[in-house]
């Protein structure tokens, strides 16, 4: 039975074949989000931010509902990659636009349901991927007035209130691709 660490390279291989993957695109393992309260098992940053939650045979789906809600606040696409033992419950518990992949004990992987674009992203949570200097750069680029003494959460709120999600998303993608290159 494969554990999440063994599933991750199989998943990366599948993603590289099934999705556009250019030289400048990156895979990010264990990316923290929602104020470091959550962690995505794998994120693919290409023209969008795609997150994957891995549930191995040894895991349960007991935390998936809360995890799914958090993923929806931050990522363009969300996928659940689960062991075949979890498939029925996964299909019942996943929102209709969450993609579902199944992995077996022999390193096989199959797409059960394709992910659809997520329309529930939250601008404030999206800014949580950015470091302070990246937040300041985004503010300067768009003329959003901030002060160096402002708390990071205050700057994030100002940017969320002032900018469209497309501008925030583009900056987050560029920063993450640069940071994890």
Locate the predicted segments by residue.
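Surface-exposed, flexible loop/turn segments at secondary-structure boundaries
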Residues: 50, 86, 106-108
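Active-site metal-binding core of divalent-cation-utilizing nuclease and nuclease-like domains
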Residues: 2-50
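Non-catalytic C-terminal interaction segments of nucleic acid-processing enzymes
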Residues: 16, 99-181
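Catalytic cores of nucleic-acid endonucleases
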Residues: 59-101
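Interdomain/boundary linker segments immediately adjacent to catalytic/signaling cores
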Residues: 1-2, 181
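Short beta-strand-loop-alpha-helix junction that forms the active-site gateway
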Residues: 48-61
